[in-house]
């Protein structure tokens, strides 16, 4: 049985060799696709670079609308200004630098947006919103009377690419207290509230606002402060009703102890002279009383000096007929 199986195994092995040889031949005969590589171009045949466009100034017409080119304040643009502008001081003697890439032209402010044509267009556009100046306001006194509040603000021009300045937001409001409807109590209280913002010499109250980032906001805030101060000055607190003469901000002659004492003294002197026809109103209107009043008020409200003391001394002598 083993002898019969041996020839069968040999025949199977020879067939396997024939099949393996056939498959190898078929595989070698079939072409294998290889990945294609991009073809290299020589160095002198590179694709051309993109050409830079010509500046805008070469395409501008002579009769173009210039306010459309520079409508607002902006830094200098060399590609938009058709002028051979040069600026700078070269180290070696020569021609100043051209406008292309010139930093000196960017530093300084320009007024290319404020040409005569642009100003004329602005005026024509604003005519519909403007009215004629009132004919009755023909003097500064009348303007101050009808418009007592004065608003000051400043626009800055600085050397730099930015047209903004943080100090331009500051607003200063000025008004004379005499133009406001205030009585004696309200005026003194308002002066006490504002402190150093009030100038006694010129009678002007100055309010400066710079807390807000915009000028309009600072203007509204200044008007708001003035409104609050005005209404608060008219309020009378309970403790204000109990103020005595020593608590007053300034000495007032009317109904003061000095007025009462001098009236009593003069009435006693007149009674001793048996002259009962003179009353208090006539005594207060005499020249001696007026001089004594001025000297006392000056001595109380102002600093004491030799001049005020001598005036007080002379007024007392004349009042009491003392030589």
Curated annotation (Swiss-Prot):
Residues 31-59 are annotated as: Disordered. One of its GO terms (molecular function) is RNA binding. Keywords: Coiled coil, Mitochondrion, Ribonucleoprotein, Ribosomal protein, Transit peptide. InterPro entries: Ribosomal_mS35_mit, Ribosomal_mS35_mt. It is found in: Mitochondrion. One of its GO terms (cellular component) is mitochondrial inner membrane. Residues 257-321 form a coiled coil. Belongs to the mitochondrion-specific ribosomal protein mS35 family. This is Small ribosomal subunit protein mS35. It comes from Homo sapiens (Human). The gene is MRPS35.
């Amino acid at each position: 049985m083993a002898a019969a199986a041996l020839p069968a195994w040999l025949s199977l092995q020879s067939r396997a060799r024939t099949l393996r040889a056939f498959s190898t031949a078929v595989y070698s005969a079939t072409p294998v696709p290889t990945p294609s590589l991009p073809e290299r171009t020589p160095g002198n045949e590179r694709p051309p670079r993109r050409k830079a466009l010509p500046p805008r100034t070469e395409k501008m017409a002579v009769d173009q609308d210039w306010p459309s080119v520079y409508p607002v304040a902006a830094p200098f643009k060399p590609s938009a200004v058709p002028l051979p502008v040069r600026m700078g001081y070269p180290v070696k003697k020569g021609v100043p630098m051209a406008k292309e890439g010139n930093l000196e032209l960017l530093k300084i402010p320009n007024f290319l947006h404020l040409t005569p044509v642009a100003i004329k267009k602005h005026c024509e556009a604003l005519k519909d919103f403007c009215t004629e100046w009132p004919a009755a306001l023909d003097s500064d006194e009348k303007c101050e009377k009808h418009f007592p509040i004065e608003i000051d603000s400043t626009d800055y021009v600085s050397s730099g690419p930015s047209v903004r300045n943080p100090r331009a937001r500051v607003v200063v409001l000025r008004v004379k207290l005499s133009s406001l409807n205030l009585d004696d109590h309200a005026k003194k209280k308002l002066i006490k509230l504002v402190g150093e913002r009030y100038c006694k010499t010129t009678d002007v109250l100055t309010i400066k606002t710079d807390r807000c980032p915009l000028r309009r906001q600072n203007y509204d805030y200044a008007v708001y402060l003035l409104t609050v101060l005005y209404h608060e000055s008219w309020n009378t607190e309970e403790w204000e009703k109990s103020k005595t003469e020593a608590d007053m901000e300034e000495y007032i002659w009317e109904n003061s102890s000095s007025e009462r004492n001098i009236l009593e003294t003069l009435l006693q002197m007149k009674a001793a002279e048996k002259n009962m026809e003179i009353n208090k109103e006539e005594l207060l209107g005499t020249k001696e009383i007026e001089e004594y009043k001025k000297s006392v008020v000056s001595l109380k409200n102002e600093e004491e000096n030799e001049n005020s003391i001598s005036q007080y001394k002379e007024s007392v002598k004349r009042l009491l007929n003392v030589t």
